Amino acid sequence: MEISYGRALWRNFLGQSPDWYKLALIIFLIVNPLVFAVAPFVAGWLLVVEFIFTLAMALKCYPLLPGGLLAIEALLIGMTSPAHVREEIAGNLEVLLLLMFMVAGIYFMKQLLLFVFTRLLLGIRSKMLLSLAFCLAAAFLSAFLDALTVVAVVISVAVGFYGIYHRVASARPDDSDLLNDSHIEQHYREVLEQFRGFLRSLMMHAGVGTALGGVMTMVGEPQNLIIAKAAGWHFGEFFLRMAPVTLPVMVCGLLTCLLVEKYRLFGYGEPLPPTVRKVLQEFDDRSRAQRSRQERLRLIAQALIGVWLIVALAFHLAEVGLIGLSVIILATTFTGVTDEHAIGKAFTEALPFTALLTVFFSIVAVIIDQQLFTPVIEFVLQASPHAQLSLFYLFNGLLSSISDNVFVGTVYINEAKAALEHGAISLPQFEMLAVAINTGTNLPSVATPNGQAAFLFLLTSALAPLIRLSYGRMVWMALPYTIVLTLVGLLCVEFTLMPVTDWLLAHGWLVTPTLP
């Protein structure tokens, strides 16, 4: 019997999301206008909390839908105006271009990245050195490329290798159901479990590597570009401004990688089983033997385009998004991708997040119009200039660990910029706060998948169920990194940021810019 129209409407509303989640969103949408009519400031904070809730529940429903409904309602009831939202979007156009074009551009360099990570995995036999290499490679790539793309490539390598061994273990060469272990013998099942542990640890090291590298440069994370634009920094200066915090954090992060592997802590330390290595090596040898000259030339072309990307970013030859567009044009031209649909696939990864970021800017417009963060900023600015840095770092870190760090970084840098424009803080102090905001937004956010988009991408990927990587296990495996990165970052903000920055200014490495 066919269901009623009411039941059909309920099922269509937010699709497969749990009923309690749908009900919660409906309550939000009913309550917000009522509260706004009585107490606009309270309603504004209610909206922010609700929006953070949708980000935290990203596994129940992609936040674009519920967050978008909340943003539309905020516009309809007058919490902000379409004109203000347009201003926010226009002011952050570079970030949208970064997400649209740079991520799509790197998509056409995936063959090269797959080649690099495959060579690492099979070329390094020591698990400690392999983990360090994956972490370092992910960090380096994330400093210039989008972290999501780097993680996507590592996922592709892991799924490919898992599938190769799973088919051998199941004695079914054509089996595509990688989740089904029922027909695998006990011995192979034990080896497969070890292989899962090995892949879990590598994926987590690579994920943390993207955070370590992503915090260092203005293109490493979307919020970095927003912060760099607010402070008037280019690529080189951004790196030097962050270096007093990010370089010690990088060293301590890599030491953590070695320690958890050596002492097999927090689920790390599982080596690659010899039988699996043998199977993978044989497969790779066959693949390399079959590689044509055309495929080799594609890899060389992608490597040269990678060099162009790094040089163009380092010397700020154009806006980041336009450099990404040049990568799309060069990569498609020299790898022979000419079909419109094949090119279109490159944009599917980034556009949902680009749309979500546009919704972020709507919420930011509400925060500005309703002056929601004014009491928080006034409280922080009452402290001494030195204490302000630690407070900004901690406030950012706390919110970024449960919410999306792009949203948090955007809100706080806007508030700091407003304080500068109103004369509440000096220009040198604003620059220090920008460093504290950027590092506070990026480093503690490794605590949960909600904070790091790359972690959330990994958790929702096809690989996660294959290697038994759940939300809880991811938080547990990230814990040593969370503690080390957060504490070392805080200590550096507290003790090394100001003296090292003063030294760089005194020796002409940095200059105080004229703000845009």
UniProtKB/Swiss-Prot annotation:
GO terms for molecular function: sodium:proton antiporter activity. It is found in: Cell inner membrane. Disulfide bonds: none annotated. It comes from the Bacteria. The chain crosses the membrane at residues 23-43, 61-80, 97-117, 120-140, 144-164, 202-222, 238-258, 303-323, 348-368, 391-411, 447-467, 475-495. Keywords: Antiport, Cell inner membrane, Cell membrane, Ion transport, Membrane, Sodium, Sodium transport, Transmembrane, Transmembrane helix, Transport. It is a multi-pass membrane protein. GO terms for cellular component: plasma membrane. The keyword Transmembrane applies. It catalyses: 2 Na(+)(in) + 3 H(+)(out) = 2 Na(+)(out) + 3 H(+)(in). InterPro entries: Na+/H+_antiporter_NhaB. NCBIfam families: NhaB (TIGR00774), PRK09547.1 (NF007093). Na(+)/H(+) antiporter that extrudes sodium in exchange for external protons. Belongs to the NhaB Na(+)/H(+) (TC 2.A.34) antiporter family. This is Na(+)/H(+) antiporter NhaB. It comes from Klebsiella pneumoniae subsp. pneumoniae (strain ATCC 700721 / MGH 78578).
